[in-house]
Swiss-Prot record:
Pathway note: Isoprenoid biosynthesis; isopentenyl diphosphate biosynthesis via DXP pathway; isopentenyl diphosphate from 1-deoxy-D-xylulose 5-phosphate: step 3/6
Similarity-based family: Belongs to the GHMP kinase family. IspE subfamily.
Reactions performed catalytically: 4-CDP-2-C-methyl-D-erythritol + ATP = 4-CDP-2-C-methyl-D-erythritol 2-phosphate + ADP + H(+)
Chain residues that bind ATP: 94-104
Top enzyme class: transferase
HAMAP family assigned: IspE (MF_00061)
SUPFAM superfamilies, sorted: GHMP Kinase, C-terminal domain, Ribosomal protein S5 domain 2-like
UniProt protein name: 4-diphosphocytidyl-2-C-methyl-D-erythritol kinase
PANTHER family xref list: 4-DIPHOSPHOCYTIDYL-2-C-METHYL-D-ERYTHRITOL KINASE, CHLOROPLASTIC
GO molecular function annotation: 4-(cytidine 5'-diphospho)-2-C-methyl-D-erythritol kinase activity; ATP binding
Keyword Repeat: no
E.C. designation(s): 2.7.1.148
Entry's Gene Ontology BP terms: isopentenyl diphosphate biosynthetic process, methylerythritol 4-phosphate pathway; terpenoid biosynthetic process
Length: 286
């Protein structure tokens, strides 16, 4: 195989509790990740000269600092391959939105290049490499909805319901560093240590601080909250609410479209990236 095109799906944090702060400054979390059937798309073409080249410029992100390029070069170095790749990105997911755009792109890059370069790397090894790029990368590498602990890297598969979501995208980028260093951030939630999604006693501990500091996010939560429970994902800026059908979700988004930007997407416990990879494996073995 010389070329490969794969999706990089969005994720939601259905809830996010901060249960402590480690000596190294990182926060101990409990959260549930679920994927959306909505995301970026990446195309890869094999090179035999070892060059890694991303042909899509991302504003304010230098080429060599892009997580896609960093993931590709790290996999190249760790595997010892002499092959390279040309990479093109169709960017759909917002930066600083809390829906995993950069982490998902990095995970898709690792899985795609392991396939193109015919590396004998299993999911565990790719996820461990992904963790060095970001705490959210492993869940995208593994591709199954998960209850996460630690800094978000200790994953236990779960299967929450898969509703339709309205996701609103406030036109502001939230700084994760700013939120996690904020003095008013809750850092002492009681550990649930529960694998199922808790009913009625879950929340996003980052949400009060983000609402306080980002009025655009507060407005989005208030707008969506008129129709269903609205919640922040990650540190934002995106907010989401669940609906039982696409028709209901589409109707609500249409009603909000005069003042809010967003999209409708289906929740999925198996990422569309992994569904695509599974179909490729079936085709190649047929």
């Amino acid at each position: 195989m010389q070329k490969l095109t794969l999706p990089a799906p969005a994720k939601l944090n259905l809830w996010l509790h901060i249960i402590g702060r480690r000596a190294d400054g990182y926060h101990e979390l409990e959260t549930v990740f679920q994927f959306l059937d909505h995301g970026d798309e990446l195309s890869f073409a094999l090179r035999d000269d070892g060059v890694i080249r991303l042909h899509t410029e991302i504003e304010a992100v230098p080429h060599d600092s892009n997580l896609i390029v960093r993931a590709a070069r790290m996999l190249q170095a760790q595997s010892g391959t002499t092959l390279g790749a040309d990479i093109w990105l169709t960017k759909v997911l917002p930066m600083g939105g809390g829906i995993g755009g950069g982490s998902s792109d990095a995970a898709t890059t690792l899985l795609a290049l392991a396939h193109l370069w015919q590396l004998d790397w299993d999911e565990d090894r790719l996820a461990a490499l992904g963790l060095s790029l970001g705490a959210d990368v492993p869940v995208f590498v593994r591709g199954h909805a998960a209850f996460a602990q630690g800094v978000g890297e200790q994953l236990t598969p779960v299967d929450p319901i898969e509703p339709w979501y309205v996701v609103l995208v406030p036109q502001v980028s939230v700084s994760t560093v700013e939120i996690f260093s904020h003095p008013q951030l809750t850092r002492d939630s009681l550990p649930l240590k529960m694998r199922p999604v808790p009913e009625g006693n879950s929340r996003n501990d980052c949400q009060p601080v983000v609402e306080q500091n980002y009025p655009q996010v507060r407005n989005a939560l208030n707008s969506l909250g008129k129709f269903t429970e609205a919640r922040l994902t990650g540190t934002g800026s995106c907010v989401f609410g669940a609906f039982p059908s696409k028709a209901e979700a589409d109707k609500v988004l249409a009603l909000l479209s005069a003042t809010q930007t967003g999209f409708v997407a289906k929740g999925s416990n198996i990422s569309m990236l992994h569904r695509k990879l599974q179909s490729l494996v079936k085709k190649s073995s047929a």
